[in-house]
Every structure is written in C-alpha cells, then in structure tokens.
Amino acid sequence: MLTLLGLGMILCFMYLIMTRRMSALVALTLIPVIFALIAYVLGFFFDSLSHIEIQNLGEMMLEGVKKLAPTGIMLLFAILYFAIMIDTGLFDPSVKWILRLVKGDPLKVTLGTITLTLIVSLDGDGSTTYMICVAAMLPLYKRLGMSPLVMACLMMLSSGIMNLTPWGGPTARAASALHVDPSDVFVPMIVPMICAIAWVYFMGYMYGRMERKRLGIITLDISHGDNIQISSNPEANRAHLRWFNTLLTVVLMICLVKSVLPMSVLFMIALCIALVVNYKDINMQKDLIAHHAGSALNVVGIIFAAGIFTGILAGTGMVDSMSKELVAIIPESMGPFLAPITAILSMPLTFFMSNDAFYYGVLPVLSEAALHYGISPVEMARAAIVGQPVHLLSPLVPSTYLLCGLAGIDFGQHQKFAIKWAILTCLVMMLGGLIFGGFPFYSTLP
C-alpha cells in the first residue's frame, strides 16, 4: 500500500505540473500533505500504514526542509551573486565574443551552448553551471529569437553527462554505496560518456539546423557589439572594475571546487564583497538586492517546498517500500541481465526518488543479487550512473528549478520537451557501456 501511495503521489504531482493545473511550489507542498493524510486514514484499515501518525507529519516535513536548507541558502545567495555580476557587466565581453563568433547563425549557437556547458560543468555542480551558462547564452538566444527550451535541454543533457566525473555526486554515491573506488567506476565510462556527448552534439546540430531554417542566419551589426549589455540596469554597470569581478569569480570557483568552505557560505561572502567593492552607496545595494529578490525567492521557495515533498516521501517509508517492491518484481531468470536492467531502471528510479534513495537504498540490493551471477559491484556501479540525464528532469532536483527560472521557462514545459531526448541520451550511454566493456550485457556464474 505504501508503494501505491508513493507512486500515486509522484504521478499526481507530475500530472498537475505538466498540465499546468498547479505551480511547482503549490504542488510540492499540498500534494504530499494530502497523500500523507490519506495514508494516516488508511492506517486504520491497513497494518502497513499504521505507523503513520498525524503528530509525526510535521517532523517529517521539517526534516526534509532541514536537509535542503543548505541548498536553498546557497541558491539564494548564488542567484543574487551572479545577478550582481551581470549588472556589473562581467559577462558582457564573453557575450560580445560569442556574438562575433556565431555571427547570427543558430547552428553555431546550439553547438556553442553544448561546448560551454561541457567546459563549465567540469566543476561538478549543476547550479553553478546553469547560472554561468544561462547568463552567457540566454541574451544571445533572445537576440536571435531562438527557443530557450532548446537551450535548457542542451545544457541539462550536457551537465548530466559531465556530472559523472569522480567528484560529481552520482559516481561518488554509487562508489561509496558499493565500497569501490570512484576512479574504477569512472575511467571505463569515459568512452560511453564520449558517445553520449557526440549524441548531444548531433542533437544540437539538428536543432541548430531547424532554428536556422526557421529564423535564417540573422545579420547582426557586429560593429555595434561594444554597446551590447546583458544587464537591463545600465546604471549598475562597472566596466572599470571588471578585472576585480573576474578575479573574485575565479577565486570563488576555485574555492567551490576545493570545498574550502560550504557553498552557501562562499556565495554569501562573495556577494558581500562584490556589493561593497562595486557599489559604495548603501541605498543602491538595497535597490539591487530588491530588484533581483523576486527571481531568487521564487527558486528558493520551490526548494523548501521540495523539502516537504521529500520529507514525507522518506518519513512515511514510501521510498523504501517502492525500492523493495521494484527490486522484488525482477524475475530470477533475468538475473544474468542485471547490469543492463540496472542501467534501464536507473532512469525511472532516479526520476521518482532522490539519488541518495536510489544509490544507498536500491543499488546495494541489486548489486548483492548480481554477485550471484558473476557481476561485480564496480560493474553495477557503472550501470547505475547511466540514468543521470533523466534524473535531472526529476522534480526532486533543485538545480532544475534554477535552470527553468533563469531561462524563463515553465518546469512542466521543460520536462515535456526534454524527456525523450534525456531517455535517448541515457540509452546511447548504456549502449556505449555495453560495447566498450563498462558493464556486461549477460553474465553467468564465474
């Protein structure tokens, strides 16, 4: 019964936001509360639900919010930081350079989007990647009249592939859950990742051709490129301090990669330094923060609402129940195929549950079963990270809300547009893993 309620809650949520009957903030808050109350009432009739008590629901929700609080704080100050950097004109030269390079060709823009995202996402953090890449590319998409849905899709897929580096979350979780070395998981997956990257470039080429056909190669007056500004607030431009802002941002990125301090603290410090150096007038500092507060609070509000969703999902035992039931339905005759089965399951399972729930709850059970057929834990770990491009479309991923907010697109629209391409990207990576020996298609007892 817990499994049915968990699946019902997730499917109901997905339906409401994809059909735009509810906003993500409202759905993430109300739907889990309603299903938790349903579970409480059904607990009088089903023993499997008798452990759910009304007085415990608040603790479950608060626990979920606490877990996502650092992420919410980080996003609040990160959005404000990059918004201030845009106002100062930090990214104006990069946009001008890209503008001169693409010369109004949508095909070059889509391919450039992928390249930029692949490079920036090497730091392993999706939120930072989206903030930098959207800041650089969105003005160009708007100027050419290209669809921001295409931009968001290409960025998400590129980030999903590059997030498989050893310092990225999925590989580290899979390795720690199965007690294997992250480098042993990652190195054999390099070629499959290259295959997936090649596929994303093909997608970018295809969409670039479509946008070129729709819009044509637009003639941009490059001679006026020096007048191009990303910011809509020219009074906040600080071109003479660009060297300082560049240095500050580079140091911030290095500190993020080296984990010198928690991300939220680093962005808080960097934001305060940026405000003090660039804007001496306290009133101007207040005005700029107020100007960007709307977009920041919109994203952060969704993050805290997601805490309620995940808190109830985990606290009621729905996640554990779903993982056990899904593992149990795999017939014993399919045991030798557990590696590709795990790769396929990683798509829906990491969509419907968090990475932590999948890698620490489901993967060890699958890996233990696979051992009986001669499939090693490291091979299972490689198979388990294949579904990450689909995972990034999950309503449980905070950075996806950030991407949609920055790009100015609806979360449900993004899901509908990108889901088929995310699945195909995962399948290409899985095929690469099978062909190049990342994990076996079929295995027997050693």
Write out the residue ranges for each language-model feature.
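Transmembrane alpha-helix interface/packing and boundary motifs in multi-pass membrane proteins
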Residues: 13-21, 82-83, 116-125, 156-162, ...
